[in-house]
Amino acid sequence: MNLHEYQGKQLFKEYGLPVSEGYAADTAQGAVEAADRIGGEEWVVKCQVHAGGRGKAGGVKLVKNKDDIRAFAENWLGKNLVTFQTDENGQPVSKILVESCTDIANELYLGAVVDRTTRRVVFMASTEGGVEIETVAEETPEKILKAEIDPIVGPQPYQAREMAFALGLSGVQIKQFTQIFLGLAKMFEELDVALIEINPLVIKTDGNLHCLDAKVGIDGNALYRQPKLKDMQDPSQEDAREAHAAQWELNYVALDGNVGCMVNGAGLAMGTMDIVNLHGGKPANFLDVGGGATKERVAEAFKIILSDDNVKAVLVNIFGGIVRCDMIAEGIIGAVKEVGVEVPVVVRLEGTNAELGREVLANSGLDIIAAESLTDAAQKVVAAAEGK
């Protein structure tokens, strides 16, 4: 789950990190009032969306009067911002962040992520701030510094100091960098963070370090123990189908193909997508209904798949271990009747009560295509999607 910049900076402030004074507003008048609270003669206004590249798309602007703040807010609120990280539809802008200006002498990068290979949190820093870190990693990987956090002893000040020296910091800057490093590490652990980026972490003209941006991603699997963070979720920034699926505890990821897939188990779901590809099809989604799927969840999963207009056929691939195939069959029948399915549906059932499940489907009177094997299912659904 991603947070907006203003939300990330609120958390930074709670953990003692230096951030600009700023307030988020959802109206043009609110944006002007935010500037009044901040004071001064110059401000930065930023569209709040879950995507990078806002500046190049016109979503970040330096303004010198409140009329420009009002005009910026009126122009963007309620519209979609399209950047190189969004699709052609962009992301809806429902809030504008108004901040005080910062005089910048230099830009750095500081981030932290879970390295699944080493199974540790890894901090990364670079002198190439304000640039996409992926670009730096590809073109000049030697400019990225790394520090692994030992889960037993935790983050150590010496790791921050080594990084600070390598970044060319000196004097009080090293102490400030160490405080930021340790604050981020504490926040990462306590809030179940999956990703943090400060890009750029700037050196101001007065020599002090300052967090000019905040990108924070929370581990969605840990939200049950982070109620405060769960309340920060902005469903408008997510794929509508994915957000709907999450409410039903369904693991759904939208793709760009035309074969809808409903499977129980993440591994089987990926294998199903692979075999659909192998036979010339393109999956429209990843959808894992889970081992404890109920009839209601299966019906809801069907609705979510069919809400994608690109879907020309649906493949249901169920291995009955914990879940019973006859229950899945009843869910399929219920969904087909309720939604009014107009595309071919191919079903492959194996495992617990598979024979009973196939019997339930056969006696339903619905035009459902039965498959004897996974290969057979893939061939049939690809052919059906092509109208053969």
Swiss-Prot record:
HAMAP family the record matches: Succ_CoA_beta
Reaction(s) this enzyme catalyzes, per UniProt: succinate + ATP + CoA = succinyl-CoA + ADP + phosphate; GTP + succinate + CoA = succinyl-CoA + GDP + phosphate
Family: Belongs to the succinate/malate CoA ligase beta subunit family.
GO molecular function annotation: ATP binding; magnesium ion binding; succinate-CoA ligase (ADP-forming) activity; succinate-CoA ligase (GDP-forming) activity
Entry binding sites for substrate: 264, 321-323
GO biological process: succinyl-CoA metabolic process; tricarboxylic acid cycle
Origin: domain of life: Bacteria
Native source species: Alteromonas mediterranea (strain DSM 17117 / CIP 110805 / LMG 28347 / Deep ecotype)
Residues that coordinate or bind ATP: 46, 53-55, 99, 102, 107
One GO CC term, this protein: succinate-CoA ligase complex
Pfam family name, one: ATP-grasp_2
Domain ATP-grasp, chain residue ranges per copy: 9-244
Oligomeric and partner information: Heterotetramer of two alpha and two beta subunits.
Enzyme Commission (EC) number: 6.2.1.5
Protein name per UniProt: Succinate--CoA ligase [ADP-forming] subunit beta
Pathway(s) the chain acts in: Carbohydrate metabolism; tricarboxylic acid cycle; succinate from succinyl-CoA (ligase route): step 1/1
InterPro entries per record: ATP-grasp, ATP-grasp_succ-CoA_synth-type, ATP_grasp_subdomain_1, Succ-CoA_synthase_bsu_CS, SUCC_ACL_C, Succ_CoA_ligase-like_bsu, Succinyl-CoA_synth-like
Keywords, in A-Z order: ATP-binding, Ligase, Magnesium, Metal-binding, Nucleotide-binding, Tricarboxylic acid cycle
Protein's job: Succinyl-CoA synthetase functions in the citric acid cycle (TCA), coupling the hydrolysis of succinyl-CoA to the synthesis of either ATP or GTP and thus represents the only step of substrate-level phosphorylation in the TCA. The beta subunit provides nucleotide specificity of the enzyme and binds the substrate succinate, while the binding sites for coenzyme A and phosphate are found in the alpha subunit.
SUPFAM superfamilies: Glutathione synthetase ATP-binding domain-like, Succinyl-CoA synthetase domains
Cofactor note: Binds 1 Mg(2+) ion per subunit.
Enzyme class: ligase
Obligatory cofactor(s): Mg(2+)
Binding, Mg(2+): 199, 213
Residue stretches spanning the membrane: none
